[in-house]
A protein has these predicted regions:
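Structural signature of multi-pass alpha-helical membrane transport proteins
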Residues: 2-63, 70-83, 104, 196-276, ...
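Short alpha-helical transmembrane interface motifs in multi-pass membrane proteins
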Residues: 10, 89-94, 117-121, 199, ...
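Cytoplasmic-side transmembrane-helix entry/capping segments in multi-pass membrane proteins
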Residues: 59-72, 91-96, 117-128, 151-154, ...
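Membrane-interface helix termini and inter-helical loops of multi-pass transporters
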Residues: 81-89, 173-196, 244-252, 276-279, ...
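Membrane-embedded alpha-helical segments of transport systems
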Residues: 101, 130-135, 150-172, 325-327, ...
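Membrane-interface capping segments at transmembrane-helix boundaries
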Residues: 114, 277, 361-375
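Alpha-helical membrane segments and immediately flanking helix-loop junctions
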Residues: 115-155, 311-346
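Long hydrophobic alpha-helical segments that form multi-pass transmembrane helix bundles
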Residues: 157-210
Length: 377
């Protein structure tokens, strides 16, 4: 049996140096046209530190929540300009993406059960592509292997986010949308990009407080998973479409956005440690195979969506990519992506959270299917 080890704490001065290096890398990335450079730079720097120093770095909730609000607002802005008929047009691509995701997640869970002899509970929660932190919490409730679920979920998230800049550049070149190409690869004026509008800042504060108040008031009747993503998007669309709130208030800019991207990058890269990778070294080939299958199936689904419904290949891939929802939405915003990305990704998160809520029944079903047959009398 593997002995659990407590993650080492990170000295404050280490965090300062890592942040400084990450900011410099991000500013350089912006100059050369790397999309969502703050996510990529912070993921790379903090990820390397977490692995080689064997120190886990996880942003606290009080820091993660504002970042989630900022990114949710960024991605809700395009939805406010959509007519109802256009939203209905997203139904078929969304359905196709969800079906492919569920099939691949099911096969991945089956593979972990059969090949690595993981329990059904651990396998299901480790492979559901959506809401990594929620799956880790569920693993404790279902007595699954929380360490394995954490490793698999955040390894998938790290790989997906780390490969996004390459896929954005590659698929932009293959696409036919000049806007997407310029958005994905255009160089930025670093100084001008630091300008932060007071409207966007106020919008983030109001949105965050509104979601917080709503969850507190309704807690006795029901709870909403990922509220600072789902409710922020819902409330902002209602505010603009029905209440006439100017769009500037749901469009954060400048330092506010860069800080949110940096926090998401730390979350994606700082969770994996050398100790965690060493503990499950034998399972890594299967885990990486599962991640590769997820990315490959997303590319296949993206090709079908692009050909059948006329979207760019980049938008279709960002809509179907499995996991790292905040990072994916950030890259979609940076590349001038179609609202399809937000619609499909949000629906994927909702679908995975619903499946996660029924995880005990799913685990029970898989357990019965793989239970040893009773001995013959």
């Amino acid at each position: 049996m593997i002995k659990a080890t407590r993650p080492k704490s990170t000295p404050v001065w280490h965090l300062g140096v890592l942040t400084g290096v990450s900011v410099l890398g991000a500013l350089l990335g912006q100059r050369i046209g790397v999309p969502a450079a703050f996510i990529f730079s912070f993921l790379l720097v903090f990820g390397c530190y977490a692995i080689f120093a064997d120190r886990q770095i996880t942003p606290p909730k009080k820091v993660m929540t504002p970042a989630q609000v900022v990114i949710a607002l960024l991605c809700s802005a395009p939805l406010t300009t959509l007519p109802t008929s256009q939203i209905a047009h997203y139904a078929l691509p969304t359905t196709l993406s969800l079906v492919v995701t569920f099939i691949v997640c099911g096969f991945a869970a089956w593979s972990l059960v059969r090949v690595n002899r993981q329990s059904p509970a651990t396998s299901v929660l480790a492979t559901l592509a959506g809401g990594a932190s929620a799956m880790v919490m569920l693993s404790r409730e279902l007595n699954a292997d929380t360490r394995f679920v954490t490793l698999t979920q955040y390894l998938r998230l790290s790989v997906v986010v780390f490969t996004l800049p390459a896929f954005v550049s590659l698929l932009s070149g293959l696409g036919d949308s000049s806007a997407g190409i310029s958005g994905a690869s255009g160089k930025k004026d670093v100084i001008a990009g630091l300008a932060t509008s007071w409207q966007g800042l106020m919008g983030c504060v109001v949105a965050g407080l509104t979601v917080w108040a709503f969850t507190k008031v309704t807690a006795r009747w029901f709870t909403v998973s990922s509220p600072y993503l789902l409710l922020t998007i819902a409330f902002s669309v209602v505010a603009v479409k029905l209440l006439g709130v100017p769009g500037e208030f749901i469009t954060p800019t400048g330092v506010l956005v860069d800080a949110a991207y940096a926090i998401i990058g730390v979350q994606a890269g700082g969770t994996l440690t050398k100790g965690a990778l060493r503990q499950f070294a034998q399972a890594l080939p299967v885990i990486f195979g599962v991640i590769a299958l997820m990315i490959g199936s997303s590319l296949a689904a993206a090709w079908v969506i692009a050909r059948a419904w006329g979207y760019t290949l980049l938008d279709a891939y960002l809509a179907t990519v499995p996991g790292g929802v905040y990072a994916v939405l950030a890259f979609a915003h940076e590349s001038g992506g179609d609202p399809l990305v937000t619609v499909v990704q949000v629906m994927r998160v909702i679908a995975m959270l619903v499946v996660g809520a029924y995880a005990p029944q799913i685990v029970s079903f898989i357990s019965r299917r793989h239970a040893a047959p009773p001995p013959r009398s």
